[in-house]
Amino acid sequence: MTGRETMKTIMEAKDISNADLAHSLGISLAAAWDRVNSVKLKDISSSILAQTLGAMGYKLVAIPVEADIPKSAFIID
């Protein structure tokens, strides 16, 4: 799953709209839409992804490959 796919999945599960996300991040609706839907780039930078996930109650972490993954976690490839 890509970073953008992860964001969309979380937004759907938590019923977060682009407007809600924009408000939480203090950015314009257009900027929020671009983070979630932009096709200009293959994926989103880790710093922007971490900021966006934080606004949705998640965080971006690096863990050892052999570590157990919690059920509520997402693996970003």
Regions found by a protein language model. Give the residues of each.
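Short, charged recognition helix plus adjacent turn
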Residues: D34, G54, V61-D77
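Recognition helix of helix-turn-helix/homeodomain-like DNA-binding domains
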Residues: G26-D43
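Short, basic-rich loop-to-helix N-cap that marks the start of a DNA-contacting helix
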Residues: V39-G54
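A short, Lys/Arg-rich alpha-helix, primarily the initiator
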Residues: M1-I16, S24
